[in-house]
């Protein structure tokens, strides 16, 4: 049976399309993907992303443990702020892309992908058990995925909405910085973050989930429903719209962001395979802090020394056509790779995509061809984002 978020019943009643995604039954759109997409680029929309995974790491050894199981330097950001970091397997392949918040008092919260939290829970606990063979750890790992509600408010008008709701200016926060706030007595964490390329904020708080896998922990989501409706009501003057996962995907693709399972992945195998993706291949080495030990580091160093045969590149269509995952990519008649994500940009009105290609072609300005329905269609590689960052995005010119 598919998993469900706290206010699934509201989505089922109000969304035009609800279907399974990564094991969760989720709203795909309410009005249309294009309508919700443009609401984020030009105004504001709210997403229920309570299907994302959350873990709490607590104890004197929490920081050292997280430094070992993730790639970035978790020790730098002060409380309360987050770090974008990766979890790798021993072969250097990406198990997931995560966000880790330093909550203070030896406590950290990790946010991970919806289809990764179960395997990460098993992974972290296995590592913890292995370390404890050499001595006890002061560390508790708690999976809060089914308990935590998470709403993402995105778009240029999100700043105004945050001022109205919480009396804070999110532009005073750096990216991934967070604050503890209240809404009608409901305490929550607010972070300046998102997955759309636009300015925005996300709120986290615990509530009962009527679809919790443990029957004894089920209950009515009074807080989640109240917060959701309150944000929608407060955002009416800004034209707020509820948005589904369809728009979330087209928005992240326009921004040039990777998606686990498409651009980053690991095989559930015990042998190296080219279908596994490392941070070096996915252009995610900005999330690696090399001056520490972490799982997968040795494999990455070897790969860096050997050379990287293929890398991610972004491209836009010149000819008419919509690229899709798995479509073949050519240059000068030579097969050089395949598409990992593709769509028709609701903002630009053209086909855009991301592909894995031979490294020599992974740079802007290269003319390529994408095989669409058996026919080669012209395209050109570009640097992300696909939109003009002076007109759109979190750092657009006012």
From Swiss-Prot:
- Identify the EC number(s): 2.1.2.10
As given in the record, the signal peptide range reads none
Under the GO molecular function aspect, what terms does this record hold?
aminomethyltransferase activity; transaminase activity
Q: Does the keyword Transferase apply?
A: yes
Q: Name one GO biological process term.
A: glycine decarboxylation via glycine cleavage system
- Please give the Pfam families that the UniProt record associates with this protein: GCV_T, GCV_T_C
Reaction catalyzed: N(6)-[(R)-S(8)-aminomethyldihydrolipoyl]-L-lysyl-[protein] + (6S)-5,6,7,8-tetrahydrofolate = N(6)-[(R)-dihydrolipoyl]-L-lysyl-[protein] + (6R)-5,10-methylene-5,6,7,8-tetrahydrofolate + NH4(+)
Cellular component aspect of the GO annotation: glycine cleavage complex
Q: What class of enzyme is it?
A: transferase
Which key words are in the record? Aminotransferase, Transferase
Report disulfide bridges, numbered on this chain: none
Q: What role does this protein play?
A: The glycine cleavage system catalyzes the degradation of glycine.
Q: How does it assemble?
A: The glycine cleavage system is composed of four proteins: P, T, L and H.
Family label: Belongs to the GcvT family.
Protein name, as recorded: Probable aminomethyltransferase
């Amino acid at each position: 049976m598919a998993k469900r978020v706290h206010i699934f019943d509201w989505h089922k009643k109000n969304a035009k399309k609800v279907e399974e995604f990564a094991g969760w039954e989720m709203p795909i759109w309410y009005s249309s993907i294009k309508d919700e997409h443009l609401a984020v680029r030009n105004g504001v929309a709210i997403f229920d992303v309570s299907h994302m995974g959350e873990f709490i790491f607590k104890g004197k050894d929490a920081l050292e443990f997280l430094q070992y199981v993730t790639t970035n330097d978790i020790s730098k950001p002060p409380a309360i702020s987050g770090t974008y970091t990766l979890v790798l397997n021993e072969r250097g392949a990406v198990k997931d892309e995560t966000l880790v918040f330093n909550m203070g008092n030896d406590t950290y919260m990790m946010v991970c992908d919806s289809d990764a939290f179960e395997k990460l829970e098993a992974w972290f606990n296995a590592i913890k058990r292995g370390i404890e063979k050499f001595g006890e750890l002061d560390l508790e790992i708690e999976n809060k995925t089914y308990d935590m509600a998470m709403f993402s408010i995105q778009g240029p008008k999100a700043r105004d909405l945050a001022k109205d709701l919480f009396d804070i200016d999110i532009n005073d926060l750096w990216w991934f910085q967070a604050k503890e706030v209240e809404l009608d007595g409901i305490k929550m964490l607010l972070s300046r973050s998102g997955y759309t390329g636009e300015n925005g904020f996300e709120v986290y708080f615990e509530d009962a989930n009527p679809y919790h896998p443990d029957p004894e922990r089920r209950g009515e989501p009074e807080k989640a429903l109240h917060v959701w409706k309150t944000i929608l009501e407060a955002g009416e003057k800004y034209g707020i719209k509820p948005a589904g996962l369809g728009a979330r995907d087209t928005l992240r693709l326009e921004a040039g962001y990777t998606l686990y399972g498409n651009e980053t992945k690991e095989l559930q195998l015990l042998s190296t395979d080219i279908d596994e993706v490392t941070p070096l291949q996915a252009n995610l080495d900005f999330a690696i802090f090399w001056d520490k030990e972490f799982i997968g580091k040795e494999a990455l160093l070897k790969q860096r020394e050997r050379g990287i045969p293929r890398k991610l590149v972004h491209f836009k269509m010149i000819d008419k056509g919509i690229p899709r995952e798995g479509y073949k990519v050519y240059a000068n008649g030579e097969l050089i790779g395949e598409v990992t994500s593709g769509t028709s940009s609701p903002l630009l009105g053209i086909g855009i995509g991301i592909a894995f290609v031979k490294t020599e072609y992974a740079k802007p300005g290269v003319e390529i061809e994408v095989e669409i329905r058996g026919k080669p269609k012209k395209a050109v590689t570009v640097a992300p984002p696909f939109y003009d960052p002076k007109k759109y995005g979190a750092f657009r010119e006012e």
